[in-house]
Amino acid sequence: MTLDALKRQAAARALEYVEDGMRLGLGTGSTAKHFVELLGERVRDGLKVVGVPTSEATRADAERCGIPLTTLDDLDRLDLTVDGADEIDPDLNLIKGGGGALLREKIVAAASERMIVIADETKWVAGLGRFPLPIEVIPFGLAATRRAIAEAFTKAGASGQMVVRKGPDGLAFVTDGGHWIFDAHLGQIPDASHLAGLLNPIPGVVEHGLFIGLARVAMLAGAQGIRVVERR
């Protein structure tokens, strides 16, 4: 079975948690796109839901699939967010942001009663850090922000190269919010929660891709089927 087919399996399993009348956060990325497409099929069959997209790309996909959309300005809470992840550890802490939507993804996840992460089994890791950690930053004062981030890595016992993410045109990738992204190649993060706490207050850091304590359930698709992991 292909990796794409496994992603679709995980998305289909998450769809079982969706009930009529729910307010849903719609994630970004290849696996989340499968969920949006499958949700669209259910909507066309009569399911009544409303979604909040986490990126302009997801907004376009949801509109194409006929899913009614709204914003967090019109809703105080969401019932459920379904999103993918770049890495998932045994505590269901995540690295996200490979698709560049980490800021909106975290806002939507934090506004949800429950977050389900869907992925193929290759995203399950013993510890976070092999996937480059995205850090969304304001372009102004970039060198000063980079130095402060590097100091935070040292305090957290992590080290590695930071590079500005580039788009297909070779220029700096620009997020939906107009920011840039550092991708930090750390290899291993000894304590993800500690590092998150060090990054949060840095001036110039808008958000980072460490999602600590937000996911409640992970659905991992593999050759043997779907493995459901709930946060301890």
UniProtKB/Swiss-Prot annotation:
CDD domains: RPI_A. It comes from the Bacteria. Gene3D superfamilies: 3.30.70.260, 3.40.50.1360. One of its GO terms (biological process) is pentose-phosphate shunt, non-oxidative branch. InterPro entries: NagB/RpiA_transferase-like, Ribose-5P_isomerase, Ribose5P_isomerase_typA_subgr, Ribose5P_isomerase_type_A. It catalyses: aldehydo-D-ribose 5-phosphate = D-ribulose 5-phosphate. Substrate binds at T28, G29, S30, T31, D83, G84, A85, D86, K96, G97, G98, G99, K123. The active site is at E105 (proton acceptor). Catalyzes the reversible conversion of ribose-5-phosphate to ribulose 5-phosphate. Homodimer. This is Ribose-5-phosphate isomerase A. It comes from Nitrobacter hamburgensis (strain DSM 10229 / NCIMB 13809 / X14). The gene is rpiA.
